[in-house]
Amino acid sequence: MAGRLDEDLKDVTLLGNQNTKYLFEYSPEILEVFDNNHPNRDYFVKFNCPEFTSLCPKTGQPDFATIYISYIPEQRMVESKSLKLYLFSFRNHGDFHEDCMNVIMNDLIKLMDPRYIEVWGKFTPRGGISIDPYCNYGRPGTKYEQMADYRMMNHDLYPETIDNR
């Protein structure tokens, strides 16, 4: 199989762009997609995002997290540089940890319409407590809906040893 042609990537504008603009306000419109060349196969795509930051909506203090985004694509896939810039746009966004994870998941569902997706944030402790919100989605009426239920019930059965992240 030959690699992707330039015409296949016409909607991917941020990758390789040396004039990248970093947006400091929540910007879902920066997300870009490309076609999944393997839509007849189930497979996971996982992003490990260790530099996520947002702001506490009450105090304005920064929150830091590693975010794990895993999804099973259908027809469209998120382009990784646009995802990086999108996550960066949360830098000055004031929202609770749980809200940030659900907003990210909802934006990616709207963008890609994946078969399945999960977003897990592992935030560094503040005030001696770390918060690790997990959300997922499986396309209704399909095996992915059942998969989402199963993974929700079993996603964190083994407590981790916290070493201050």
UniProtKB/Swiss-Prot annotation:
Entries under Gene3D superfamilies matching the protein: 3.30.1130.10
Q: Where is the active site?
A: 56 (thioimide intermediate), 63 (proton donor)
Q: In which pathway does it act?
A: tRNA modification; tRNA-queuosine biosynthesis
Under the heading InterPro entries, the entry gives: GTP-CH-I_C/QueF, NADPH_dep_7-cyano-7-deazaG_red, QueF, QueF_type1
What catalytic activity does the UniProt entry give for this protein? 7-aminomethyl-7-carbaguanine + 2 NADP(+) = 7-cyano-7-deazaguanine + 2 NADPH + 3 H(+)
Q: Which GO terms describe its biological process?
A: queuosine biosynthetic process; tRNA modification
Enzyme Commission designation: 1.7.1.13
Question: What are the boundaries of the signal sequence?
Answer: none
Q: Where in the cell is it found?
A: Cytoplasm
Which chain regions cross the lipid bilayer? none
Q: Which UniProt keywords apply?
A: Cytoplasm, NADP, Oxidoreductase, Queuosine biosynthesis
GO terms for MF: preQ1 synthase activity
Q: Pfam families of this UniProt entry?
A: QueF
Which residues does the annotation say bind substrate? 78-80, 97-98
GO cellular component entries: cytoplasm
The coiled-coil segments of this chain are: none
The similarity annotation says: Belongs to the GTP cyclohydrolase I family. QueF type 1 subfamily.
Q: Which HAMAP family match?
A: QueF_type1
What is the protein's known function? Catalyzes the NADPH-dependent reduction of 7-cyano-7-deazaguanine (preQ0) to 7-aminomethyl-7-deazaguanine (preQ1).
This protein's name: NADPH-dependent 7-cyano-7-deazaguanine reductase
Gene name for this UniProt entry: queF
